[in-house]
Amino acid sequence: MAFKYHKVAIVGKHYKKEVSQMVETLYAYLQQQGLEIIIENDTAADTSLVNVAIASLKEIALRCDVAIVVGGDGNFLKASRLLALYSNIPVIGINKGKLGFLTTLAADDNALKNDLYAILKGDSSVTKMSMLKYRVDNNLRAPLEASIALNEIAITASRGLMFGLKVFIDGRYAFDQRGDGLIVSTPTGSTAHAMSAGGPILNPNQNSVVLVPICSHSLNSRPLVISDESVIDIYITDYNDPEPVLSIDGRHDTILKAHQKVTIQKARKKVTVLHTKDYNYYDTLREKLGWSKVLF
């Protein structure tokens, strides 16, 4: 069977020696397969490779058939989100981090010679990960890369001081909340910040988003799962200095003022992730969350 993906990009986490070594190993393996390889600019600079083709993430998205991201979930999150803004390029994650919820291929010879080989031949399963976008007071001037989230959009207190929110869903009043903040999460993000705040785990293929209160000053506040077709309007009603901040996937903090409106809805773009043919999301949950471990 011929390869389905011929022009392959490699993206790694910068300044990590073990990632750079894996990038070099991966490059050599792909060369042996006769594939065309392009390495992301900063990733290439961290290696000892010479005379290699390099490109920016935008160029990779527009020129390559597939991108392999080497690193942890954070690096995968950042790279795949940015790649998806420019094209529908599929992404493969090789884990050189800690948990590996998103980077599902192991960083070893067996994974390269069997799992990665099969995926590049087209023998794979696909997950389409939805993303969220936001705007503040209907202002559309924020850079695209700073307004799209793969995991979550969070509005949080700057120094642990409570503030007030009023939430509308599809134009209808939903609830008021005072507390440390609110997380609006995709299914992908439901195993990240949202889970730490007590939210439910959503299957990545589920067409939902979840609103998770952060330390609400009420015993009645609970996570709320809604359709990902809904439009969420969040008003900042009051706060104690300093102002609350909005972040996407833990980055790009935006300071919010009283009476400002944050509108959140599903983004048009999705991240396409390739897995092995026998990939089972529940295996990942069981392994990473220790569901099968005996505690005593």
Swiss-Prot record:
It comes from the Bacteria. It is found in: Cytoplasm. Coiled coil: none annotated. Its main location: cytoplasm. Belongs to the NAD kinase family. The active site is at residue 73. This is NAD kinase. It comes from Francisella tularensis subsp. mediasiatica (strain FSC147). Gene3D superfamilies: Probable inorganic polyphosphate/atp-NAD kinase, domain 1, Probable inorganic polyphosphate/atp-NAD kinase, domain 2. One of its GO terms (molecular function) is NAD+ kinase activity. It is an enzyme of class 2 (transferase).
